[in-house]
């Protein structure tokens, strides 16, 4: 056999590739990892942020401290306990008092960022500045943000995570009224000016389609509004007023205009210069119910237009997707020319909360006499496909199917449709209800959650490496178990187990240990300079 002679440099490079593995740009991801590699932070781009997420009402508690006023969730869960599993956020998991301890839990995980939300009524107890400002409430978030930064953890702040001031709900119906736009801008502008010098990553609204649909179309979350024919089958008790097929669109319209006004205020804020702002969207992925059915395949784009394009198209392009205009018609409010101009390009990044996927089937015969949001998309959400197969896997304790392929597909979809924007994964996590088996021992042995995180981190890495998606950060939902809205405390998402029977003691779970070890390899971003502390 005759061997072709190679230059010494080529031979050296060949041996380097054999010994070291794939070459990588110093700032880029390792693409692909060696087959023997255990995925870790080291395989992601330099400066990629990893963190955990929470929300004020779900973790803070201390509802009577700092002169905090009531939110819709305070009143909803106390007045209708059956709609919140008999639980409420009065104490939640005591984060208000234990945040310093909990920040040490974040450090233990090797995370470098933390997503929190500000309670509107801890700043303005009755919704507006003219009704009073809680100085101690304002100081609480200063103290929290300062403590995070002292510990090298970058704060990401959500301005609104579903806790509308009850005063504004009573006065004009909250987000059902256009009055909310002015009041939200005032509140957002206040927190930007107060914290904008310390916080450079902002989210105006969390999961707007869920907020509108669950709260105003199927009655599943506060304020529990729906038409009786549209009420979600899991909801206990009656709809608390409402008009399905109409109110969700009105609420979202006001929310989007409030977002645009808040972004304008943010971009005019001197302290906020160099910061970024966006929305945390919450898409599922859809696979065709029947791959042989052309109509079934066409449902995917339509479903995504309704649950993501509804708010993402609008903040990118200035208006609703054409599919929504065509189908919803007069029930979909119209933007003015001025509103369109403010909405267009009103996000610096795309926040994505991803949990699960489902099958989509074309809805042949919608009932026009009983309009409702999901029906409007002409899509049926199906748990199993035409062959009676569940999407992904469905662990016994998990209420949602696990399908990490859907995560990657969502990311590629956003890249392709919206010209490769910066994407930050604001939430990704696994919930489980242990029921009668709930204990510290069983709750911390969360191997299903560990598996979920492994699969989704791999899918995200493939999206970055192979699909060239511009993902820059990832937050696990959640740091610890917390109050999960209509599920109360029964649905656990945390990397730390909260012992509700024993002084809310925190216990690291198997998934927490996995995330800690995943983040222990590679360099943490040094994004906080000493002069910023």
Swiss-Prot record:
UniProt EC number: 3.2.1.21
Active site: 207, 427
First and last residue of the signal peptide: 1-26
InterPro entries: Glyco_hydro_1 (IPR001360), Glyco_hydro_1_N_CS (IPR033132), Glycoside_hydrolase_SF (IPR017853)
Keyword Cell wall biogenesis/degradation recorded: no
Primary subcellular site in the record, as a coarse category: endoplasmic reticulum
Glycosylation sites: 64, 88, 388, 437, 442, 470, 503
Sequence intervals crossing the membrane: none
GO BP field: carbohydrate metabolic process
Subcellular location: Endoplasmic reticulum lumen
Record's keyword terms, sorted: Disulfide bond, Endoplasmic reticulum, Glycoprotein, Glycosidase, Hydrolase, Signal
Pfam families: Glyco_hydro_1
Gene Ontology cellular-component terms listed: endoplasmic reticulum lumen; plastid
Motif Prevents secretion from ER, chain ranges: 530-533
SUPFAM superfamilies (alphabetical): (Trans)glycosidases (SSF51445)
PROSITE patterns: ER_TARGET (PS00014), GLYCOSYL_HYDROL_F1_2 (PS00653)
Disulphides: 226-239
Molecular function terms, GO-annotated: beta-glucosidase activity
Enzyme class per UniProt: hydrolase
Residues that, per the record, bind a beta-D-glucoside: 58, 161, 206-207, 355, 427, 477, 484-485, 493
Record protein name field: Beta-glucosidase 24
The species this protein was found in: Arabidopsis thaliana
Gene: BGLU24
């Amino acid at each position: 056999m005759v061997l072709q002679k190679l230059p010494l440099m080529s031979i050296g490079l060949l041996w380097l590739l054999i010994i070291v593995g794939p070459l990588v740009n110093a700032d880029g991801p390792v693409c692909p990892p060696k087959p023997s590699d255990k995925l870790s932070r080291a395989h992601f781009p330099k400066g990629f942020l990893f963190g955990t997420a929470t929300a004020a009402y779900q973790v803070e508690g201390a509802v009577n401290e700092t002169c905090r006023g009531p939110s819709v969730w305070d009143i909803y869960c106390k007045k209708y306990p059956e709609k919140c599993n008999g639980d409420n956020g009065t104490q939640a998991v005591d984060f208000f008092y234990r945040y310093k301890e909990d920040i040490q839990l974040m450090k233990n995980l090797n995370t470098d960022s933390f997503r929190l939300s500000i309670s509107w009524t801890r700043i303005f107890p009755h919704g507006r500045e003219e009704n009073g400002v809680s100085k101690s409430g304002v100081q609480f978030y200063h103290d929290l943000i300062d403590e995070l930064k002292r510990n090298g953890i970058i704060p990401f702040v959500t301005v609104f995570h579903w806790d509308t001031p009850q005063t504004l709900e009573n006065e004009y119906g909250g987000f059902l009224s256009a009055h909310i736009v002015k009041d939200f801008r005032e509140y957002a502008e206040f927190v930007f000016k107060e914290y904008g010098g310390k916080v450079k990553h902002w989210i105006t609204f969390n999961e707007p389609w869920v907020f509108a649909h669950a709260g105003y179309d199927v009655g599943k979350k506060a304020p529990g509004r729906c038409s009786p024919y549209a009420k979600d089958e899991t909801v206990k008790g009656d709809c608390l007023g409402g008009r399905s097929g109409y109110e969700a669109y009105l609420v979202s319209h006001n929310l989007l205009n409030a977002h645009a006004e808040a972004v304008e205020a943010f971009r005019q804020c001197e302290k906020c210069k160099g910061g970024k702002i966006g929305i945390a969207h919450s898409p599922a992925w859809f696979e065709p119910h029947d791959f042989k059915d052309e109509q079934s395949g066409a449902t995917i784009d339509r479903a995504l237009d309704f649950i993501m394009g509804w708010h993402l198209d609008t903040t990118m392009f200035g208006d609703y997707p054409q599919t929504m205009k065509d189908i919803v018609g007069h029930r979909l409010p119209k933007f003015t020319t001025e509103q369109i101009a403010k909405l267009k390009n009103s996000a610096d990044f795309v926040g994505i909360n991803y949990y699960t996927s489902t099958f989509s089937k074309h809805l042949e015969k919608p009932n026009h006499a009983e309009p409702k949001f999901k029906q409007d998309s002409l899509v049926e959400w199906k748990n199993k496909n035409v062959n009676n197969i569940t999407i992904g896997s469905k662990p016994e304790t998990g209420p949602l199917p696990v399908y990490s392929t859907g995560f990657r597909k969502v990311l590629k979809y956003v890249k392709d449709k919206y010209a490769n924007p910066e994407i930050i994964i604001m939430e990704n996590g696994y919930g489980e209800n242990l029921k009668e088996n709930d204990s510290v021992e069983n709750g911390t042995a969360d191997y299903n959650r560990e598996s979920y995180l492994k699969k989704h981190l791999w899918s995200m890495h493939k999206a970055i490496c192979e699909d060239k998606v511009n993902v820059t950060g990832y937050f696990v939902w959640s740091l610890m178990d917390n109050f999960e809205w209509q599920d109360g405390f029964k649905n656990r998402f945390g990397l730390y187990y909260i012992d509700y029977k024993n002084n809310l003691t925190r216990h690291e779970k198997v998934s927490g240990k996995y995330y800690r070890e995943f983040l222990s390899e590679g360099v943490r971003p040094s994004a906080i300079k000493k002069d910023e502390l």
